Amino acid sequence: MIAANFPWLSVLVAIPAAGAALLGFVSPLRRAAGRVIALVVSLVELALGVYVAASVFDWSAPASYQVYESHLWIPQIGITWSLGVTSLGLVMILLAIGLVPLVLIAGWDEDDAADRGAYPALVLALQAFMVVIFAAYDLTVFYFAFEAMLVPLYLTIGRYGVGDEAARHKAAMKFLLYSLFGGLVMLGGILYLWAAGSRAVQDVSLFFRMDTLAHILPSAPLVIQMVIFVTFMVAFAIKAPMVPVHTWLPDTAAVARPGTSVLLVGVLDKIGTFGMITLCLQLTPGAASSAKWVMCVLAVISILWGGLSANGQNDIMRLVSYTSVSHFGFMVLGIFIGSQIALVGAMFYMVAHGVSIAAMFLLSGWLSRRGGTQDMREYVGMQRVTPVLAGLWLVSGLASIALSGLSGFVPEYLVLMGTWTVSGPLALFAVLGVVIAALYVLMPYQRVFTGAPGKGKEDLADLNGRERGVMVPLVAAMLVLGIWSAPLVSALTPVASDLGLPTTQVGATAEGSAQ
C-alpha cells in the first residue's frame, strides 16, 4: 500500500510536465507520434486524478486542505513547494484534466504538419500549470504558475491559431500584454505583503505558505488588506474576465483553435474566480467586505454588457466568448455578494460553465471548419445538413443559459437566490441577464440552423464518430450536473461555510433544488 504522505499532487504535476518535455525536446518522437503520446499521457493523468479523488481525498472534510505536501525551497524569502487541495481545488483539477484528452481528440486531424507534436506538448504544459495553480498551498507557487502559463498560451494562440497570421499575432500580443500587466500588479502586491508582514512572523521560511498568511492577513490593518486585495483583484479581474478589462477575450477566441479556447475559457479563466475565493475572500476578508458593492456592481455590468455584446456578434466564436463574459459576471456576483448560497452557486457555476462552454466552442469550431468561415451570416438551415451538430449546439446553449435539468440551472438559481436575500435590485438586474442570455442562444440558433440550407452549404458533413465521441462525456456531464447536483453542492458548501458567510432562509429551498 502506498504511504498516506505520498506526493500525489506533485506526481499530477510531473506527469504532463514530463510528457511536454518529451514531446518538446525529442524531435523523432515529435515527428512520429506526438498526438498519440500526448493523449496517453493525458489519460494516465486523468486516471490518477480520479484515483486521488476516489481513494485519497476525504470528502467528509472537503473544506480542509488535503493531499498535503510541503518542502522548503527558498527559505530566506519564505518560499516553499507546498501543495494541497480543498474540494474546490480538486474539482477544478478534475475539470482540467478531464477536458485535456477531449481537446486532444477533438483536434486530432487539425493541421500541424510543420511541427507535429508541438501543439500537444503545449497543451500538456498547460495541464501541468493548471494542476499547480489549483493545488498551490504557497502564494509564490501560485504566482509562478500564474505567470508561466502565459508562454504556452501565447504560442497556442499566436502560432497555432486559425485564420490570418497577423490577426493571430495581434490577438496573442493583446492577451499577453493584458495578462502581464495584471501579473505585474499582483507581483507588486506580493512584494508589499513581504515588506509589510515578514517582520510579523518569527520564522520567515514559511511566510508565503497559506496557513501562515491565513494567520496574519485577516487580522492585519484594513489599509494593508486593501493594498493586497486591489493588486490581486486587478490580475484576477483580467483573468476572469470582467468588464472593462475583458476585451482581450473575444479577439483571442476569434483566432484560437477551438481546443485552445476550451482550455482558456473553460478552465484557465476560472483561475480568476478561484483566486478571488481562495486568496481575496480568505486572506483579506475586511477588504473584500469593504469592496463588496463595487465588485457586485461590476459583476452585474459584466452580466449585462457581455450578454448585449454577444447579441451583436456575427462571428460565432466571438459570440461564444462574449457569453462567457456574462457568465463570469454571475460567478463574481456570487463570490462577493456575501451569501453562502450564492458562493456555493458561484463555485458550482465554475464547473458547469466549463462543461457547457467546452461543448459550444468545439461545436462552433467544427461548424466553422466545415463551412470555411466563422461568419454566422454565411449559414442557414444547418439542422437539415448537420442535424447532430445542430442538436448538440442547442443542448449546449440551453445548458449555458440555465435551462432546468441541465448543468447551468442549479448554480444560476443559487447565485440569484443568494443575491436576492442581500440585494433585491441587484438580483433583478442580474435576472435581465437571464433574459438576454435566451436571446443570444436562441436567435443565433434560428439564424444558423433553421430554415432551408443555404447555397454552397448543402453538402457539409455532420459530426463524425470521433467528434460524437468527444461530445458524449460533455453532454453526460451537463445532464448529471443538472439532474443529480446534490453531491457537488454538498462538497462545495463546507468551503463556503469555512469563510464564515451568512446563511439565508432560502438555504433549504436551494439545497432542495439541487437534489
What is each residue range found by the language model?
Residues 57-80, 168-172, 184-246, 276-294, ...:
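Juxtamembrane/interfacial segments at transmembrane-helix boundaries in multi-pass membrane proteins
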Residues 29-31, 118, 122-125, 129-220, ...:
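Alpha-helical multi-pass transmembrane bundles of energy-transducing inner-membrane proteins
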Residues 243, 356-363, 427-460:
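Predominantly late transmembrane helices and immediately cytosolic-facing juxtamembrane segments
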Residues 1-3, 84, 131-139, 223, ...:
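Helix-coil boundary and interhelical linker segments in multi-pass alpha-helical membrane proteins
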Residues 4-15, 85-96, 140-152, 225-236, ...:
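Structural signature of hydrophobic alpha-helical transmembrane segments
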Residues 10-25, 39-52, 93-108, 126-127, ...:
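Central hydrophobic cores of alpha-helical transmembrane segments in multi-pass inner-membrane proteins
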Residues 1-8, 22-121, 203-215, 498:
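Transmembrane helix-loop-helix hairpins at membrane boundaries of multipass inner-membrane proteins
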